[in-house]
A protein has these predicted regions:
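Conserved N-terminal phosphate-binding loop of PLP-dependent enzymes in the Aspartate aminotransferase
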Residues: 1-480
Length: 480
């Protein structure tokens, strides 16, 4: 029976053009006979590809034995096993785990855990309800997560529903935020001072936590932290007895070359949020981990965590995630991710960076972004109304290209600033990476060739000529 389009998509006038009928490896097979190369693992999710038999078997076995039981009444071996694995994966630096269903949900749980921690102290600090996040960040689509985020396209329609107990400071972005002539050490010091100033502006006793993506995700396009950034930020948090929450929903669970992205930053969070690649798309699952400091406040207070959801610690999701993580560990995939990631980064820079409208290529592991600008010198973004990122994605999905690129915008000011992510499954080979880069290059070349022959290009080139004389202020990733 053919679909009747009863499913509500984000755009009422459009729906996904391709109906996927089957999958194999890193490819998606459409109903019209095309084979889409998934260069983005969906949204950095399907890290083991689409047909891992061991994970499928683990899900089926769990479905047959214990498909579901109420997480408030019972426990299951699958959920206990996944929580144990997650805690052990941090070498004991994190102490407990909460299992959730999505990244947005996990962020909500992290906020509630942080607030509850301060309420449970021997001398409760109930005034701590303010969260500081980063300009240009994205933490999810639910209302609490939207409070933290700065992706204006998705946030602004709901601003009247969103809590005002949050504020933003500049993110660490060497491409967009670092000043000419400013070395890394000075830039990091400036960002740390900005956070310190924000604590003082809000009132140190009112701030609950600073929340950041360890490596920027879809909104910022893999914004990379400089060496020393997170230790400096953690020092500010500790100075005022606030918590550090790291959101690794997109960049974590091996995506950047270590199981946890913070392992490369010489810092340990108080609360860690993971998702996406945790279950590799074989089940909807995410998790929140807390350190011993939070566990101690709960234990000493003798009070619980006032939170519960129907599908928390879902046994099928836990079984899938546990098997996924065991495969990543047992097959030494982290080494492969680092190797293939280095190759992917070098080939992207070699093939795409010389193109006139590619401003920056950044990333690590199998997590890379390509940002587009009208002018490499001024870094001016393309007009938001042009929808360049959508044009690139649409061409990639069309016949003759057949590659999925994770397109996004907002990296400049929350609206404009076009980029796409390339974050393929961990199972890619060198040949796969080469094919991804070549198809991507053709998409970019042909999209700009077509744009160059269009009427809209005259307006863009006129603005480019102005930019050559008048350097625009750099607005992305910098707090107003």
């Amino acid at each position: 029976m053919a679909p009747t389009n009863s499913l509500l998509y984000k755009n009422f006038q459009k729906h996904p053009a391709a109906l996927i009928e089957s999958t194999e490896g890193i490819y998606l097979n459409t109903s019209d006979g095309r084979k889409i190369l998934d260069a983005t693992s969906g949204a950095a999710v399907a890290c083991l590809g689409y047909d891992n038999k061991d994970v499928q078997r683990a899900v089926v076995e769990q479905l047959v034995s214990v498909p579901y039981c109420h997480p408030g009444f019972y426990k299951t071996q699958a959920a206990e096993g996944l929580a144990d694995f997650l805690v052990e994966s941090t070498n004991g630096l994190m102490s407990k785990a909460v299992l959730c269903g999505s990244g947005s949900e996990a962020v909500e749980v992290a906020l509630k855990l942080a607030k509850t921690h301060f309420s449970h102290l021997a001398i409760p600090q109930t005034e701590r309800s303010h969260f500081i996040a980063c300009v240009g960040a994205w933490h999810g689509a639910t209302l609490g997560a939207l409070t933290l985020g700065d992706f204006k396209v998705r946030k602004d329609p709901f601003v009247q529903l969103i809590s005002q107990n949050s504020s933003r400071v500049s993110a660490c972005s060497s491409y967009r935020g670092q000043r000419d002539g400013e070395d890394d050490e000075a830039y990091v010091a400036r960002l740390a001072q900005e956070l310190d100033d924000e604590f003082l502006r809000i009132g140190p006793d009112k701030v609950c936590a600073f929340v950041a993506e360890t490596v920027g995700g879809s909104a910022s396009g893999c914004a990379m932290p400089l060496k020393g950034y997170f230790p400096a930020i953690k020092a500010v948090c500790e100075k005022y007895n606030a918590l550090l929450i790291l959101d690794e929903v997109m960049c974590g669970m091996g995506r950047t070359g270590t199981l946890h992205a913070w392992e490369q930053e010489d810092v340990v969070p108080d609360i860690l949020v993971v998702g996406k690649g945790l279950g590799a798309g074989y089940a909807p699952v995410s998790a929140v981990m807390i350190n011993s400091k939070l566990v101690e406040s709960f234990q000493k207070s003798g009070k619980g965590f006032a939170h519960g959801q129907t599908y928390m610690a879902h046994p099928q999701a836990a079984a899938a995630a546990l098997k996924v993580q065991q495969i990543i560990r047992d097959e030494n995939m982290l080494s492969h991710i680092r190797s293939m990631g280095a190759y992917l980064g070098s080939k992207l820079k070699e093939r795409l960076l010389p193109m006139p409208y590619v401003g920056d290529i950044r990333g690590r592991g199998l997590f890379w972004a390509v940002e587009f600008v009208t002018n490499k010198k001024t870094k001016t973004p393309f007009p938001y109304d042009l929808g360049l990122n959508s044009l690139l994605h649409s061409r990639g999905m069309s016949a003759g290209y057949e590659i999925a690129l994770f397109n996004a915008n907002g990296g400049y000011d929350g609206y404009s600033g076009d980029h796409f992510l390339i974050c393929p499954p961990f199972i890619v080979t060198k040949e796969d990476v080469y094919e991804i880069v070549e198809r991507t290059a053709r998409v970019v070349e042909d999209t700009f060739e077509e744009l160059g022959n269009s009427a809209v290009w005259e307006k863009i080139t006129l603005q480019m000529e102005i930019d050559d004389v008048e350097v625009k202020p750099v607005g992305a990733m910098v707090a107003a």
